[in-house]
Amino acid sequence: LIDKVLGIGEVALSDHRSSQPTKDEMKRIATQARLGGMLSGKAGVLQLHMGSGKSGLSMIFEILDETEVPARHFIPTHVNRCPKLLRQAKELARRGGYMDITSGGRLCDGFTGGVEPHEAIRQCYEEGVPMDHVTMSSDGNGGMSVPQPDGTVKLLTARLHSLHEELRQAVLDGVPLEVAV
């Protein structure tokens, strides 16, 4: 673990696997992460496992508008799962929050409906999203579900080497190496 970070996570939002926390519960959790960070001299973050549900990050934006918790305490993951979620994550990063792109959910690996990781990085760079608020992780060998047309769910594995491949492709797409890394 990183000694400069204290936090809570991953809390699932907008996902069929979520326990569907209420906005008040999320306000309390975010405040606890923030206060824990303040008391310990660490970041105090709330990491969010994001699904592709229709609400996306809307609850987080409501919390930011209704409380004194700064955006920097929120880190949604899997934000390239669908285009709408990626757009919301870019807005969160512009407001001072962070966003984590998943390299392990690529079309070539059987995932559909998402934004290719290298494409998400390129979009962020070209649209002026603060790149020091954008991270990418592989979700290393994590199980990822892909809904099927018949209502079943196919399980796939996020491959570790996808991180290197996607960073390489982002550079080939025009993102400067020092920005991509």
Predicted segment positions?
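Histidine/acidic residue-rich metal-binding segments in metalloenzymes
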Residues: 2-101, 111-135
